Swiss-Prot record:
Pfam families xref list: QCR10
Main location: mitochondrion
Record's keyword terms, sorted: Electron transport, Membrane, Mitochondrion, Mitochondrion inner membrane, Respiratory chain, Transmembrane, Transmembrane helix, Transport
Name of the protein in its database record: Cytochrome b-c1 complex subunit 10, mitochondrial
Heme as UniProt keyword: no
Upper classification of the organism: Eukaryota, Fungi, Dikarya, Ascomycota, Saccharomycotina
Coiled-coil stretches: none
Membrane side Mitochondrial matrix: residue ranges: 2-21
Organism: Saccharomyces cerevisiae (strain ATCC 204508 / S288c) (Baker's yeast)
Family per record: Belongs to the UQCR11/QCR10 family.
Stretches assigned to the Mitochondrial intermembrane side: 46-77
Membrane-spanning residues: 22-45
Membrane topology label: Single-pass membrane protein
Length: 77
């Protein structure tokens, strides 16, 4: 029987208190909240012209719905 003076165990991969096991347990919840926050961002920035020109008009299904088909005589100055 050999005597060892210290505990021979290895620690798992971790960053602070966050381990790989806890990340995999929280992954579905984090994906749900991330997707919901992205949808909220899309809803609240839909009316901003800067976002329409740079982002929304480049999405294939959403782009044609944002084009302005108003005749020039009906537009304000």
């Amino acid at each position: 029987m050999a005597y060892t003076s210290h505990l021979s165990s290895k620690t798992g991969l971790h960053f602070g208190r966050l381990s790989l096991r806890s990340l995999t347990a929280y992954a579905p919840n984090l994906m749900l909240w991330g997707g919901a926050s992205m949808l909220g961002l899309f809803v609240f920035t839909e009316g901003w012209p800067k976002f329409q020109d740079t982002l929304y008009k480049k999405i294939p299904l959403l782009g044609p719905t944002l084009e302005d088909h108003t005749p020039p005589e009906d537009k304000p100055n």
